[in-house]
């Protein structure tokens, strides 16, 4: 699973996910990409599940880039615990994704293989996504 090696603080505020993604919303490395259409927290497990599904589908042909990284800790309180006594312990890591953000990129494969691989990866995601192709002017 992806997670930061070290952070300055163990716990974070939840924050707001309003607006669209102004960074990380263009294809940079590959020719095809999977773009988010809704805001969400995507866990490191979901990112890894999508990556594995894509690599299985494309076999040895293509190269992949994961464009999101889970850098926000999510704290969870133990079950059947009374209120108070502070915030819970960090349980897992999430990437904050806004609409327009590129999740994965792929290159070195045909359009059909890329579309199929991304559709499998998209089914692992908790949000609606779209398949986009790099347009060179």
Curated annotation (Swiss-Prot):
A GO-annotated cellular component: plastid
PROSITE patterns tied to this protein: RIBOSOMAL_L16_2
Gene3D superfamilies in the record: Ribosomal protein L10e/L16
Main location: plastid
Keyword Repeat recorded: no
Gene name of the encoded protein: rpl16
Subunit structure: Part of the 50S ribosomal subunit.
Name the record gives this protein: Large ribosomal subunit protein uL16c
Alphabetically ordered keywords of this record: Plastid, Ribonucleoprotein, Ribosomal protein
Species of origin: Cuscuta reflexa
InterPro entries: Ribosomal_uL16, Ribosomal_uL16_bact-type, Ribosomal_uL16_CS, Ribosomal_uL16_dom, Ribosomal_uL16_sf
Family: Belongs to the universal ribosomal protein uL16 family.
Gene Ontology biological process: mitochondrial translation
The organism's place on the tree of life at top rank: Eukaryota
Alphabetized HAMAP family for the sequence: Ribosomal_uL16 (MF_01342)
Gene Ontology molecular functions: rRNA binding; structural constituent of ribosome
